[in-house]
Swiss-Prot record:
The keyword RNA-binding does not apply. It comes from Colwellia psychrerythraea (strain 34H / ATCC BAA-681). It is found in: Cytoplasm. Keywords: Chaperone, Cytoplasm. The keyword Cytoplasm applies. This is Co-chaperonin GroES. Heptamer of 7 subunits arranged in a ring. Interacts with the chaperonin GroEL. Belongs to the GroES chaperonin family. GO terms for biological process: chaperone cofactor-dependent protein refolding. Coiled coil: none annotated. SUPFAM superfamilies: GroES-like. Together with the chaperonin GroEL, plays an essential role in assisting protein folding. The GroEL-GroES system forms a nano-cage that allows encapsulation of the non-native substrate proteins and provides a physical environment optimized to promote and accelerate protein folding. GroES binds to the apical surface of the GroEL ring, thereby capping the opening of the GroEL channel. The gene is groES. GO terms for cellular component: cytoplasm.
Amino acid sequence: MSIRPLHDRVIVKRKKVESKSAGGIVLTGSAAEKSTRGEVIAVGNGRILENGEVRPLDVKVGDQVIFSEGYGVKTEKIDGEEVLILSESDILAIVE
């Protein structure tokens, strides 16, 4: 199944968090929280402005991003994999 986000929505596959610290300690509970980094796997056409124009998104497929786990972030399972559906405004940075 493929997924195509609408407007300014972005589909992100969350990066897995290491379950061990650099010193070899196994992390559990709050120390092993979910990552706020991921890879963009699909983008919408862009934000619709008040004048009706469409502003293309700044992110593109393949970008590594840091995102906020805000109110509008939705988690879905697509083909057995968990993905996040979020607005471009929930993306804080592109990792270069």
